[in-house]
């Protein structure tokens, strides 16, 4: 059981750790010290739902529909290109806040809506949870499959809360204009890199 748990934990961590829209959003809220723990909680809850759905049946549905998989892939390409463009433009203009959210103080509900959009309207999330985690978890025996899901979920929860708390702790340094420009450049570059990788996968479908 422990080996299966660690397998799920390691695989989930490998996909979550690279910078993506969710990470950029949570990091930005941590830097601003604005509802950062709530943001981490919503990201973790969304991942729990998506990971469990992928491992316990959603992956088979996606894999049986090449058209749906293609739509998810190319939707992810478009989303990531748009998101990366916003980050690069923020870096070019020298905005003092990350492109993950608009500048200025936001209300709790606006943060919730933005975070849900960043998570649930990002098709790359479905590729990670349904195609990768779902395909591998779905091949396991039914009695050990929950342990794989538990490991994957644990990695997600631990990462988002660690990221939010670390960003809040480093806020005095990361909230400077120069640091924000570097962050925006990094976010934009990574988003476009992931988009081009997804496009290559889409051409091979």
From Swiss-Prot:
It is found in: Cell inner membrane. It catalyses: L-arginine(in) = L-arginine(out). GO terms for cellular component: plasma membrane. GO terms for molecular function: L-arginine transmembrane transporter activity. The chain crosses the membrane at residues 1-21, 42-62, 67-87, 111-131, 147-167, 182-202. It comes from the Bacteria. It is a multi-pass membrane protein. This is Arginine exporter protein ArgO. Involved in the export of arginine. Important to control the intracellular level of arginine and the correct balance between arginine and lysine. Pfam families: LysE. The lineage of its organism: Bacteria, Pseudomonadati, Pseudomonadota, Gammaproteobacteria, Enterobacterales. Keywords: Amino-acid transport, Cell inner membrane, Cell membrane, Membrane, Transmembrane, Transmembrane helix, Transport. HAMAP family: ArgO (MF_01901). Belongs to the LysE/ArgO transporter (TC 2.A.75) family. NCBIfam families: 2a75 (TIGR00948), PRK09304.1 (NF006801).
